[in-house]
């Protein structure tokens, strides 16, 4: 195995995909975050990177407007990458362990008002796709499903007699959700 940063990153993503069996979206996010690290540390020996270099990268990204949440997720990926390098590639230290991300004010998500929701759901169409979309909007609004969960639903997941839908959530957890009358 090469000690080139790109090879180490590819091996890490392979580890996440095939050994830890993380979801494809999670692996894609980790890969993107590791590419950012490699871009900022371009030309550096990953085994020799120290805490000040990681802090500098975080400061630069924060200065470019990345949110604390994005920086925290990114730093978590970097910590995991270095943890993997220590365990599988005999690196000596993790320069990311004591880095803290600048905190920002937490904002509540914007929710649709009842009027906005009614406007969204009160369209009339004889088109089959429009009927499907309306049912999806209604289910999404009334059930609290994640968008990824909604898009993965199959007709076989719907129990019309009981008025429920079987959802495969994060971590492969299955749950049964009641379906509102409108959906």
Ranges and model annotations:
Residues 1-183:
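Conserved catalytic core of the tyrosine transesterase superfamily
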């Amino acid at each position: 195995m090469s000690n080139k940063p790109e090879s180490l990153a590819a091996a890490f993503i392979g580890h996440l995909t095939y050994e830890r069996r993380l979801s494809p979206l999670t692996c894609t996010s980790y890969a993107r975050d590791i590419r950012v690290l490699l871009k900022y540390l371009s030309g550096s020996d990953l085994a020799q990177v120290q805490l000040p270099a990681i802090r500098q990268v975080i400061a630069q990204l924060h200065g470019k407007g990345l949110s604390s949440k994005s920086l925290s997720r990114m730093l978590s990926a970097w910590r995991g990458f270095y943890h993997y390098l220590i365990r599988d590639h005999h690196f000596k230290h993790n320069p990311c362990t004591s880095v803290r991300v600048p905190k920002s004010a937490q904002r509540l998500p914007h929710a649709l008002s009842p009027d906005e929701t009614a406007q969204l759901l009160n369209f009339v169409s004889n088109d089959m796709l429009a009927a499907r979309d309306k049912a999806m909007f209604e289910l999404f609004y009334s059930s609290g499903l994640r968008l990824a969960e909604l898009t993965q639903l199959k007709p076989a997941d719907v129990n019309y007699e009981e008025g429920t839908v079987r959802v495969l959530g994060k971590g492969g957890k299955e749950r049964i959700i009641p379906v509102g009358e409108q959906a």
